[in-house]
């Protein structure tokens, strides 16, 4: 289990992980690491939340929110934001399914992708600022949001097909079973309930699950399946939806 955690941490983040900690784990077995996604999200959110807490007293909530979101982006290397941008460029191109997938592979940033990045990043900053002004616990909120968003991404992997012939997303999409999905969602729910008691966190997770499930069905109908880019988009949108649900 420890090898899986370190392998997943180095796979979906840019945090430094010694190679020997995950050595010997075959890439084809990475799908088993889905159950570590909520824990990795918890770690990322906690670090981002700590940055917010340290900076809030010095420069106020808006700037603290800006830097906490920036730290979150840096820790993931913009991996999920890139998926969001590519997904929006493809889906909103109003082309054929094959052409959409080609556009999503293009490394150039299009208008729709750029607008999506601006909207999501700005929305996160504004929502975090508002939550802070309302006296909500930002560290707990961010940790729960990142854990839940990565946990609910399993909804786009379970019983979905991969829309392309090959790619990184193929490691997870269609490769996880019902037990892994339930464990992943269960861990995310536990983190949300513990960090944000009074059913506040669980209610926000339910809203997030519904949103991500609907997103998955829409993408399935549009693209014929899921890709690594759509998983990244789901994680980014999941974070935002969860935080919005806390308002």
UniProtKB/Swiss-Prot annotation:
Pfam families, per database record: CobS
Keywords: Cell inner membrane, Cell membrane, Cobalamin biosynthesis, Magnesium, Membrane, Transferase, Transmembrane, Transmembrane helix
Pathway: Cofactor biosynthesis; adenosylcobalamin biosynthesis; adenosylcobalamin from cob(II)yrinate a,c-diamide: step 7/7
Cell compartment(s), UniProt: Cell inner membrane
Cofactor: Mg(2+)
A cellular component term, taken from the record's GO annotations: plasma membrane
HAMAP family xref list: CobS (MF_00719)
UniProt keyword Plastid present: no
Family membership: Belongs to the CobS family.
Protein function: Joins adenosylcobinamide-GDP and alpha-ribazole to generate adenosylcobalamin (Ado-cobalamin). Also synthesizes adenosylcobalamin 5'-phosphate from adenosylcobinamide-GDP and alpha-ribazole 5'-phosphate.
Membrane-related topology note: Multi-pass membrane protein
Example of a GO MF term: adenosylcobinamide-GDP ribazoletransferase activity
GO aspect biological process, one term: cobalamin biosynthetic process
Enzyme Commission code(s) on record: 2.7.8.26
Transmembrane regions: 34-54, 59-79, 113-133, 138-158, 194-214
Protein name: Adenosylcobinamide-GDP ribazoletransferase
Swiss-Prot/TrEMBL catalytic activity: alpha-ribazole + adenosylcob(III)inamide-GDP = adenosylcob(III)alamin + GMP + H(+); alpha-ribazole 5'-phosphate + adenosylcob(III)inamide-GDP = adenosylcob(III)alamin 5'-phosphate + GMP + H(+)
InterPro entries per UniProt: CobS
Chief location of this protein within or outside the cell: membrane
The keyword Magnesium appears for this protein: yes
Top-level taxon in the UniProt lineage: Bacteria
């Amino acid at each position: 289990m420890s090898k899986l955690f370190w392998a997943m941490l180095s796979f979906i983040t840019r945090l430094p992980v010694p190679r020997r900690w995950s050595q010997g784990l075959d890439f084809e077995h990475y799908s088993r690491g889905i159950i570590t996604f909520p824990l990795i999200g918890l770690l990322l959110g906690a670090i981002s939340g700590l940055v917010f807490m340290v900076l809030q007293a010095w420069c106020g909530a808006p700037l603290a929110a800006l830097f906490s979101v920036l730290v979150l982006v840096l820790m993931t290397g913009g991996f999920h934001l890139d998926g969001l941008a590519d997904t929006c460029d493809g889906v909103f191109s109003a082309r054929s399914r094959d052409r959409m997938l080609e556009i999503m592979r293009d490394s150039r940033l299009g208008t729709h992708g750029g607008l999506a990045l601006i909207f999501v990043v700005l929305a996160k900053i504004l929502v975090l600022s508002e939550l802070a002004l309302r006296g909500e616990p930002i560290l707990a909120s961010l940790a729960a949001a990142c854990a839940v968003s990565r946990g609910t991404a399993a909804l786009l992997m379970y019983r979905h097909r991969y829309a392309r012939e090959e790619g990184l997303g193929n490691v997870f999409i269609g490769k996880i079973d019902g037990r892994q999905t339930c464990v992943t969602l269960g861990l995310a729910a536990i983190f949300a309930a513990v960090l944000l008691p009074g059913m506040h966190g669980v209610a926000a997770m339910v809203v997030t699950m519904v949103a991500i499930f609907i997103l998955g069905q829409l993408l399935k109908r549009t693209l014929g399946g899921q890709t690594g880019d759509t998983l990244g988009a789901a994680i980014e949108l999941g974070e935002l939806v969860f935080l919005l649900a806390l308002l």
